[in-house]
Amino acid sequence: MIIAIDGPSASGKSSVSKALSMKLGFKFISSGYLYRIITLIAQRFTLNEYDLLNESKLVDLISQNDIKYNDNSFLLNGVDVISHILTEKIDFQVSLYSSYVNIRKIVNKKLREIVKIQDDDYIIEGRDITTVVFPEAKIKIYLDASVEVRTLRRYNQRDDDMALIELEQALEKRDEIDQNKEYGKLKLGKGVFYIDTSYKSLDDVCDIIIKTFNLKKK
């Protein structure tokens, strides 16, 4: 079974997905990690600013690097790079690369391959997961929250000195980009269950989804 969890940045997708994977014994996959790894590849291996913005060169570069799913995370060329992709530098560029159609297709193909090769139960989270990547998922959830709440959440997650107002502006810009993408735009799809997480605890959100899961099993 696949439980697909969609929604904007800092709406609770990762926290809820990780908690659900523990509660239900499902494997966890974040598409956002893949986009962040691709952003890291672009930053590490491109030689000039032109190449950073050249989609076809980036596609070739991605094919030269080995990205593997491993134990609810991803490895780049055999190395765990999670600490390198959850940074401000990655934050500011990931939306650019995730807007490239061919890069989105690479990520979507990779996600489908993982599920096909490793036949198991999955919690998969990310933007457009419910509408483009796994529209056939048994359970489709869209998590949302006010921009103020999402800003505070992101602020509390970080260990740098970025101001609240800067974070809020960055989130609003990210929302605008995600909602207007040519391919895989952020939206509430057909048959997707909407949950506003603004004033709900992590356990409350998980309980709502687990109730839906139990109903779908019958």
Curated annotation (Swiss-Prot):
Keywords associated with the record: ATP-binding, Cytoplasm, Kinase, Nucleotide-binding, Transferase
Protein's cellular compartments: Cytoplasm
GO biological processes: pyrimidine nucleotide metabolic process
Recorded superkingdom: Bacteria
EC number(s) recorded for this UniProt protein: 2.7.4.25
Lipid metabolism among keywords: no
UniProt xrefs under CDD domains: CMPK
GO cellular component: cytoplasm
Stretches of the chain forming a coiled coil according to its record: none
Primary site of residence: cytoplasm
Binding positions (ATP): G7, P8, S9, A10, S11, G12, K13, S14, S15
GO molecular function, one term: CMP kinase activity
Reaction(s) catalysed (UniProt annotation): CMP + ATP = CDP + ADP; dCMP + ATP = dCDP + ADP
Gene3D superfamilies noted in UniProt: P-loop containing nucleotide triphosphate hydrolases (3.40.50.300)
Cross-referenced HAMAP family: Cytidyl_kinase_type1 (MF_00238)
Family as reported in the entry's similarity comment: Belongs to the cytidylate kinase family. Type 1 subfamily.
Protein's recorded name: Cytidylate kinase
Organism listed in the record: Borrelia duttonii (strain Ly)
